[in-house]
Design a protein with these regions (language model features):
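A short glycine-rich beta-alpha junction/loop motif
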Residues: 99-105, 137-160
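Non-catalytic DNA-recognition/assembly elements of restriction-modification systems
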Residues: 4-27, 151
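Short, ligand-facing micro-motifs at secondary-structure edges
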Residues: 48-60, 78-103, 116-121, 130-134
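Short, well-ordered beta-strand elements within core beta-sheets of diverse protein domains
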Residues: 7, 64, 107-111, 151-156
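Cleft-lining beta-strand/loop regions that shape enzyme active-site pockets
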Residues: 43
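Sequence-specific dsDNA recognition surfaces
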Residues: 19-32, 46-77, 93
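Hydrophobic structural patches
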Residues: 1-7, 165-176
Length: 179
């Protein structure tokens, strides 16, 4: 339980596994990128901004492959980088980013019963990055697979408290982005 809380909220927070509050943990499509077709965007690790964890549309491309809904990014989806120096980088889907298909070096988790921004915010903590460092240090090439990501400890509380915290954090993130 954090030391500072909004008034009226009390009680212990619950420690659970990411895989207990999210579904999927699916790998993205194995396709090359091609020129943007005007509709279908392809998000790769390099399209996730390092500082803001948002989709960067500086170099929009489309996937060069068979487009199925299996690889579409949807509301409540979090994408996680699974290999290389960017292991641990994450992105929370926003409808304003448009129709996105995700690439094979990303893993998609859909947060089902909790506030996705609240969960996403926990993927930007010192605790998370320490976990990423430990989990990905086992071999010469850093990486975390879907089963390992699903084991990451997540803290949860009531949906009302999560939503209030998420709203505050998103307002702060928006404010920082406009500076």
């Amino acid at each position: 339980v954090p030391n500072l809380r909004f008034p009226k909220f009390q009680g212990e927070w619950k420690k659970t596994k990411f895989g207990d509050i999210a579904t999927g943990f699916d790998y993205g499509m194995n396709a090359a990128a091609k020129n943007y077709d005007g509709v279908n965007k392809y998000i790769r690790i390099t399209d996730i901004d390092e500082a803001s964890s948002t989709y960067t549309d500086k170099d929009i491309v489309s996937p060069d492959g068979i487009l199925t809904d299996n690889y579409l990014v949807n509301n409540r989806d979090i994408l996680l980088a699974r290999t290389g120096a960017s292991t641990g980088k994450s992105y929370l889907y926003k409808q304003s980013d448009g129709k996105l298909y995700y690439a094979g070096f990303l893993i998609r988790a859909n947060v089902t019963t909790h506030d996705p921004y609240f969960v996403f915010s926990q993927l930007h903590t010192h605790r998370y990055w320490r976990w990423v460092s430990i989990m990905s240090a086992r071999s010469g090439q850093p990486g975390i697979n879907s089963q390992e990501y699903s084991s990451f400890p997540i803290y949860t509380t009531s949906i009302e408290e999560e939503s209030k915290i998420a709203k505050l954090l998103s307002l702060l993130d928006e404010r920082i982005a406009t500076q």
